[in-house]
A protein has these predicted regions:
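Scaffold/interface architecture of coatomer-like assemblies
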Residues: 27-383
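N-terminal secretory signal peptides that target proteins for export/translocation
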Residues: 1-9
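Bacterial N-terminal signal peptides
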Residues: 13-24
Length: 383
């Protein structure tokens, strides 16, 4: 009996020793992946690249004859569109009929306060001339802040009341931040697809065209506007004109308005002189391409002009004979007499700048003047 007990104890001791040895081996085993052998390359897991493709490109096309009158007699077969030199198939064609989604950006800085009464009267022009019967609009005010004053609505009364009650704020002007907000708002509106028409996305900016203190840069805004098929129009407000319209004030020591440029002796202080001085007469097309390629850098050139050229719109000055009302009326007339062409790019994921060219291939097209958006920039994939 004692022998059996001693045998059982030895068996238990042996079992405990085996369990202890197994635990020690497990404790020494690596918990992570095995290190690579010397000279053997490590295979990395594939990166999740975020690829951006352009599903549909839409460009406004304005066609005028030699007298400057709009041409309304063209069909889709009369146009040729190329993207980086490759001919594209037009999938959607329209002449002024697609409904408009409009963002109205209005400068409300104290610098243009003398022009405020004129601006407050423009509401009916936006609703009757620009929006049209099927349009919708939103209103954004900008000074040193960006304020959404009215979300998208088709109510003419709401738009007109919002503009009639604009309040003047500080002297700041965050133009680029306001434009970025406008592009974001328009991106939410349905646009055309290959199966059905959509809304034309239009931004109309009433401003001096200067920027002070924005977090965004113009190139960043324009890149997004191009990819979202947003067309930008500008109505340039003149601080010189505002000063001339201001009520006389008691004599004070000379104090130049913020942003003005003193001309040399004998040169009148016109906006043309100030623009040339401030922006160096930059080539607009070169400025557009440079801007969308260098989105974190400042852009030379009048921002409203550069934005209009980049997106197929137009920028109208109001310094001389053209009033603010006339400028808005001209833009409305153009929008409803303008062609809209859409296509799906044959190489939708080719990165870099895509140059768009639109031409009229009719025999009598020699003297026609065509304006369309010049292109868009597709950034490389993000990892």
């Amino acid at each position: 009996m004692n022998g059996m007990k001693r045998g059982g104890c030895r068996a238990i001791e042996l079992l405990l020793m085996l369990l202890f040895a197994a635990g020690a081996l497990l404790a020494q085993a690596p918990t992570g992946p095995l290190p690579p052998k010397p000279g053997v390359p490590v295979q990395q897991p594939p990166k999740n690249e975020i690829k951006v493709q352009v599903a549909l490109v839409t460009t406004p096309v304005t066609v005028r004859d030699s007298h400057g009158d709009m041409v309304h007699s063209l069909d889709a077969k009369d146009f040729r569109v190329t993207d980086n030199g490759a001919a594209q198939k037009i999938s959607h064609f329209d002449l002024g009929g697609d409904p408009i989604s409009l963002v109205i950006l209005v400068e409300t800085s104290s610098r243009i306060e003398p022009l405020a009464p004129e601006i407050r009267k423009t509401g009916i022009l936006f609703t009757q001339t620009v929006m049209g019967p099927t349009g919708e609009a939103a209103v954004v005010g900008l000074n040193d802040s960006v304020d959404k004053l009215q979300d998208f609505t088709s109510s003419a009364d709401q738009i007109e009341n919002t503009i009639a009650n604009l309040r003047i704020g500080s002297s700041g002007l965050k133009l680029f931040d306001a434009m970025a907000v406008g592009v974001e708002m328009l991106t939410s509106r349905p646009q055309a697809t290959t199966e059905k028409p959509g809304r034309r996305r239009v931004m109309l900016v009433l401003s001096e065209g200067m920027d002070e203190g924005s977090e965004k840069q113009l190139g960043e805004v324009l890149r997004q506007a191009q990819l979202a098929n947003v067309t930008i129009y500008g109505v340039g407000l003149s601080t010189t004109r505002a000063e001339l319209q201001a009520k006389p004030k008691p004599p004070q020591p000379p104090n130049l308005p913020v942003g003005s440029v003193p001309p040399p002796p004998g040169v009148p202080a016109t906006p043309t002189y100030e623009d040339n001085y401030r922006y160096g007469g930059a080539d607009l097309m070169a400025a557009v391409i440079w801007a969308v390629q260098h989105i974190h850098d400042k852009v030379k050139g009048n921002p409203l002009e550069v934005a209009a050229v980049a997106t197929g719109g137009a920028q109208l000055s109001t310094f001389k004979d053209r009033s603010i009302e006339n400028a808005i009326d001209e833009i409305g007339g153009e929008l409803h007499s303008q062609y809209t062409l859409s296509y799906t790019p044959t190489e939708p994921d080719t990165t870099g700048y895509h140059e768009i060219k639109v031409s009229v291939i009719r025999n009598d097209a020699k003297n026609l003047k065509i304006r369309a958006r010049p292109g868009y920039y597709l950034a490389p994939p993000e990892s």
